[in-house]
Amino acid sequence: MKSTRPFHPTPVITIDGPTASGKGTVAALVAAHLGFHLLDSGALYRLAALASVRYGIEAEDIDALVKLIDDLHITFREGCAQLDGVDVSNDIRAEVVGNRASAIAVHGPVRTALVARQRAFRKTPGLVADGRDMGTVIFPDAVLKVFLTASAEARATRRHKQLMQKGFSANIDDLLRDLRERDARDSNRAAAPLKPAADAKLLDTSALSVDEAVDQVLQWYRALGQPA
């Protein structure tokens, strides 16, 4: 049965979910298949943080931070985060950048500026946005909302494999504990808690390959009468 959700001239597909659920990989592949723009909302905060460090802007200088965010040239292409046309995917994972991202995110005007930047990614022919509140807060009118889930054990195994492939040492029991603690924080926070939108499609990827998850999202999109 086809959805009665109205067609939007610039469609958005939102893919939300907890850490290591596979949402980033699935979002990038869906965007590539459809020829859509891609938004990695989690990386956006770190990109703003990285830029503030590089330009010497203090974490408490709210006005300068807001102007910086408004002027940033950010793109997401083929799984890479680019700042001013340069791939900074590894740079934004540095501890100093993560700490700065947490420090600037406490400011209301900074969060407002970042929300505006996220919404500005909605451009023709369409957008695939991945994050935690894309379908509930940022793009509530998305034509398709997907919420990826997976067991904590499956996600810990994936994260362990990713870290090992990158040459990092990791203990899977520690990863599992960290994921469970983060899930609890994300689900219980006052602002934009991690939860599926009321009209989201739930997709458990615990036993699915990446290709199977991507195919399911594309099937749902086609079922809406959208070209895929």
From Swiss-Prot:
ATP binds at residues 17-25. Its EC number is 2.7.4.25. Keywords: ATP-binding, Cytoplasm, Kinase, Nucleotide-binding, Transferase. Pfam families: Cytidylate_kin (PF02224). It catalyses: CMP + ATP = CDP + ADP; dCMP + ATP = dCDP + ADP. The keyword Cytoplasm applies. One of its GO terms (cellular component) is cytosol. Its main location: cytoplasm. GO terms for biological process: nucleobase-containing small molecule interconversion; pyrimidine nucleotide metabolic process. It is found in: Cytoplasm. One of its GO terms (molecular function) is CMP kinase activity. Gene3D superfamilies: P-loop containing nucleotide triphosphate hydrolases. InterPro entries: Cytidylate_kin, Cytidylate_kinase_dom, P-loop_NTPase. PANTHER family: CYTIDYLATE KINASE, CYTIDYLATE KINASE/PANTOATE-BETA-ALANINE LIGASE. Belongs to the cytidylate kinase family. Type 1 subfamily. This is Cytidylate kinase. The lineage of its organism: Bacteria, Pseudomonadati, Pseudomonadota, Betaproteobacteria, Burkholderiales. The gene is cmk.
